[in-house]
Structures are given as C-alpha cells and as structure tokens.
Amino acid sequence: MKRTIAIVAGGDTSEFHVSLRSAQGIYSFIDKEKYTLYIVEMQGTRWEVQLPDGAKAPVDRNDFSFMLGTEKIRFDFAYITIHGTPGEDGRLQGYFDMMHIPYSCCGVLAAAITYDKFTCNQYLKAFGVRIAESLLLRQGQSVSDEDVMEKIGLPCFIKPSLGGSSFGVTKVKTKEQIQPAIVKAFEEAQEVLVEAFMEGTELTCGCYKTKDKTVIFPPTEVVTHNEFFDYDAKYNGQVDEITPARISDELTNRVQMLTSAIYDILGCSGIIRVDYIVTAGEKINLLEVNTTPGMTTTSFIPQQVRAAGLDIKDVMTDIIENKF
C-alpha cells in the first residue's frame, strides 16, 4: 500500500508564498508511484488540505487527518516545507512528535536553535566554527549608532534574528542608516541581529544523512548583482548560482566536511543547507543554517542534487523511508 504524505506549507510569516512554491517543487519531486501526496496549507489556525478538484478540506488537528467524501484519510508522514513559524522553529515538530507522525526535517531542539540565527551561531562558535562579530537586540532594547560603529563597524548587516528569505535585511553603510534598519528588522521579528560585514565568496552547501549513508552535495557559489543576496536576488533572478562552485577541490572538501560536522553537532535530520562566506586566506565563516531549505525547481538543493549526478526523486525517497 502507498504511504500517504502531507507536504506541509504556508506558515505565519512573510515567507508564506515562498513556502507554497517549495511545496509545489516537492510535489513534483516525490515518486507518485510510491506515495499518495497532498499539500496541507497552514496559516494560523487554518489548516487545509488541497484536494485534486481544487477544493480544500479542513484538517482535524486531533489526529492530523481529513475527510475525503465519507473516508477519513490519515497521514503516514509529513514533509515540512514551511519557511518560518511554525514549521522551521520546532513548534510543528513538537506537534508531530505528540501525534507520533514521522516528518522530514530536524527535531524540536535543532529546529529551535537554528531558527534563531544569533543563538545558532553562538552555539556553533563554541565548537570552533568561525562566525561574524554580532550584537543581539530584543524588543524594547536599543543600541546607539556609536556602539554599532565601535563594536561591529560599517558596513554591517542589520536583520531579523528569526526568519529567512532576506525579509527585513539591510546592508548598512552609513551612520544615518542604522536606526531605520533596526526599525525595519523589528517589523519582521522580535529579535534583531547586527552583524559585521565580511568580504569574500559566498557559498552554500547541502547535506542529508540516513541510517546507512551520508550525502554531501557540491557547494554552490552565489554571485549577486544586488548589494547582497536579498529577496529580489533570490527570487527574481538577480544572481548567478554556480554549481559546483569555482573553488579548489581542497576548499570544496573543507566546506563539505564542515557542513557534515555542523549537521552532527546540531543533531539534524533530513536535508539541511549551510551558508558560508569564504574570506581572505580561505577562512570559512558560517552565515546561517537552514533546516527547511527552499525546494522550488530552481532552488539550491535541486541544483546541487543534479550536480552530484543524483535523481531528486531518489533523494526524496531516502528522506521519507529513513523515518520508517
């Protein structure tokens, strides 16, 4: 019998529509001869299954099921592709743990740690991972322009400590831009990160592990035509994504080994993607860890799967079957 898979998308942040695009990608990638697929759209308390006829059916949150005519359909597995709350921060993982429904990505602790960029980077710093100098501001806290310039320097990035897709991110070059950038970041999250700018080559590397194998993809080099890799660059083509990256075999291996180590340190599961900046002297600096990376047909992970000579359908099967 086919397993019934929920591709869980949507969420409660600005990344709602990005998540739905990832869900369509995943729907196209998963082997439909092995699995019955439904996209489950979540937004606040609205949990709905997209039905083949275009209608939507409410999800019973008591057991994560829905009615298809007179038949009650239960899900065997959840592929979480929500970018942001509640699917990337551990909340939904806790729900599925209580429902005893296996899912595609990291558990509660790893998801919660990685969703908060400051917490994740400070945690990994304790294991010897290089990170940028940074300051954290919580709601209600303030920092003077002088402190930012003295402790972090300019240019710097001011961004939400939570979330992704570069919503609320500003590259700050002048003193006058500091406070408006903080206000903008607080519109997206309750914690704001002030982070030193690092000059170098931006790389991103995906990885997944199952009970019997480790797969580390070829890194991608990110060359943006914008000021930085912002939403416009990510989703409107203002970037060159070069896979595999134009770096030496030795540096490629170091990036891949660091990605694998970060996966293990955090106790990850499923596919992750780690973003880096390589600065002078080939120093590898962590930018952030993504535990529910974008999965549109043009996203980094599908690119890296192709560059590795793998079939994305087989990768999806690995992720699902590893939980049974």
Curated annotation (Swiss-Prot):
It is an enzyme of class 6 (ligase). Pathway: Cell wall biogenesis; peptidoglycan biosynthesis. SUPFAM superfamilies: Glutathione synthetase ATP-binding domain-like, PreATP-grasp domain. The keyword Glycoprotein does not apply. It catalyses: 2 D-alanine + ATP = D-alanyl-D-alanine + ADP + phosphate + H(+). Mg(2+) 2 binds at residues 288, 290. It is found in: Cytoplasm. Keywords: ATP-binding, Cell shape, Cell wall biogenesis/degradation, Cytoplasm, Ligase, Magnesium, Manganese, Metal-binding, Nucleotide-binding, Peptidoglycan synthesis. Residues 121-321 form the ATP-grasp domain. Mg(2+) 1 binds at residues 275, 288. It holds the Pfam family Dala_Dala_lig_N. The keyword Cytoplasm applies. InterPro entries: ATP-grasp, ATP_grasp_subdomain_1, D-Ala_lig_Van_CS, D_ala_D_ala, Dala_Dala_lig_C, Dala_Dala_lig_N, PreATP-grasp_dom_sf. Its EC number is 6.3.2.4. GO terms for cellular component: cytoplasm. GO terms for molecular function: ATP binding; D-alanine-D-alanine ligase activity; metal ion binding. Its cofactor is Mg(2+); Mn(2+). Binds 2 magnesium or manganese ions per subunit. NCBIfam families: D_ala_D_alaTIGR (TIGR01205), PRK01372.1 (NF002378), PRK01966.1-3 (NF002527). PANTHER family: D-ALANINE--D-ALANINE LIGASE, D-ALANINE--D-ALANINE LIGASE B. Cell wall formation. This is D-alanine--D-alanine ligase.
